[in-house]
Swiss-Prot record:
Keywords: Mitochondrion
Subcellular location: Mitochondrion
GO cellular component, one term: matrix side of mitochondrial inner membrane
Keyword Mitochondrion listed: yes
Name the record gives this protein: Required for respiratory growth protein 1, mitochondrial
Similarity field: Belongs to the RRG1 family.
Top-rank taxon: Eukaryota
Naturally occurring in which organism (per UniProt): Candida glabrata (strain ATCC 2001 / BCRC 20586 / JCM 3761 / NBRC 0622 / NRRL Y-65 / CBS 138) (Yeast)
GO biological process, one term: mitochondrial tRNA 5'-end processing
Gene (UniProt): RRG1
The protein's role, per its UniProt record: Essential for respiratory growth and required for mitochondrial protein synthesis. Required for vacuolar acidification.
Signal peptide: none
Length: 377
């Protein structure tokens, strides 16, 4: 009797592999809403047709799932999202104009057609997480009309986010004022010193400093390439010297290159070429003749790295001088902290008592933005 396809191990392995591969591709999507929607649809359809005995139906489902997975793998999120309609048995159409508008915004952002609506998508993702959390705690019903989501729950979600932002600001003020600190980054073994403060962090960092750090790291990479080349040349030079010594007097050094020459390496900010204390090697003019140019190059590299290190050591001393760069940023940071503290106290006294999440100009987000506080929604 012919075995049904659902009992074949090859079929089960293929379906399971395709299912897992599709979920991995879904995880690459940036939008939280689209990612959740696709995972939900794929999982529900897989469970629904788990016991389906119709070969034609299963073939059609697997073919559609394979196409959906290929679209996601090629970063064609918009096409993959449109395939969900054909993948589902029953397509739920937008109940009103509002839902259709929200879906249009999400699709445009996924295809990079309208980047200005990124804030809108951020709010929708925030609303989605808010509703999911409340439903998990059984504080909201499973089915909520779209009008309630937009007009009632979205302001509450933004209000909750604003409260968390206020708490973070309050905790920051409790820790004390802003402080400048001396920091460094490594370019090999060289420390590049600079000042960190809230005045020059992230995008406010000096373009000159960024270029300086980048150029120093590139220089160090060039030194590493030169050292690698010297290491290779030293190995060849040693073998050439041994061969010429053999041609001169018939004496053959019965050793490998590592016996006479350690690898060229960067250690404690210095490049070293060390010969083994072997009298036969030291007295051999051929070896000295071949290895001396390499040793000269290594000494030049060592001097170069020492000069870079001394340069930034002097820079550190200059930064820490009285009335120098460090003192300037320290005073500036204290002044900015005092101004922020005054603004915060004025905001708490005059504006926060009248917060209303359902009125845009009285919401916490609007109040924070009016007072110059960054809000990412």
């Amino acid at each position: 009797m012919i075995t049904h396809f659902c009992e074949l191990a090859a079929h089960r392995n293929y379906v399971l592999a395709l299912y897992r591969h599709s979920l991995r591709n879904v995880s690459r999507i940036n939008s939280g809403f689209v990612k959740h929607k696709m995972k939900k649809v794929i999982t529900n359809e897989a469970r629904k047709h788990k016991n389906d005995k119709s070969s034609w139906s299963i073939y059609r489902r697997l073919k559609e799932l394979k196409l959906l997975s290929d679209k996601l793998e090629d970063d064609q999120v918009n096409d993959a999202y449109n395939l969900l309609d054909s993948f589902m048995k029953s397509v739920k159409k937008p109940k009103n104009e509002l839902k259709g508008h929200l879906m249009k915004i999400r699709t445009e952002i996924e295809t990079n057609k309208n980047i200005q609506d990124k804030t809108r998508l951020t709010r929708l993702n925030l609303l989605h997480r808010y509703i999911a959390k409340k439903q998990q705690n059984q504080l909201l019903t499973k089915h909520i009309p779209d009008e309630y989501k937009e007009k009632l729950l979205l302001p509450l979600a933004l209000h909750e986010k604003g409260i968390l932002r206020l708490a973070a600001i309050r905790n920051q003020f409790k820790k004390g004022g802003y402080h400048a600190k001396l920091s460094f980054t490594m370019a090999g073994k060289t420390r590049i010193w600079f000042i960190r403060s809230m005045l020059n962090k992230r995008k406010k960092q000096s373009l000159r400093l960024r270029n300086l750090i980048t150029s120093e790291k590139r220089r160090y990479l060039e030194v590493c390439k030169i050292v690698e080349s010297l290491n290779e040349n030293a190995n060849w030079a040693l073998h050439e010297a041994i061969w010429e010594r053999y041609l001169d007097d018939g004496y053959l050094h019965a050793t490998s290159s590592k016996g006479y020459l350690k690898m060229v390496e960067i250690e404690d900010n210095s490049v070293k070429l060390q010969n083994q204390n072997d009298s036969k090697v030291v007295k051999c003019q051929r070896l000295q003749q071949w290895l001396s140019p390499i040793q000269s190059s290594i000494l030049s590299l060592e001097n170069y790295l020492n000069q870079r290190q001394m340069k930034y050591a002097k820079l550190k001393t200059k930064i820490l001088e009285p009335k120098g760069v460090y003192d300037y940023y320290q005073k500036k940071s204290k002044r900015v902290f005092q101004n922020h503290m005054k603004t915060y106290k004025r905001m708490v006294k005059n504006e926060l008592p009248f917060v209303n999440p359902f009125i845009e100009r009285l919401s916490i987000g609007s109040i924070l933005k009016r007072n110059g506080i960054n809000v990412k929604y």
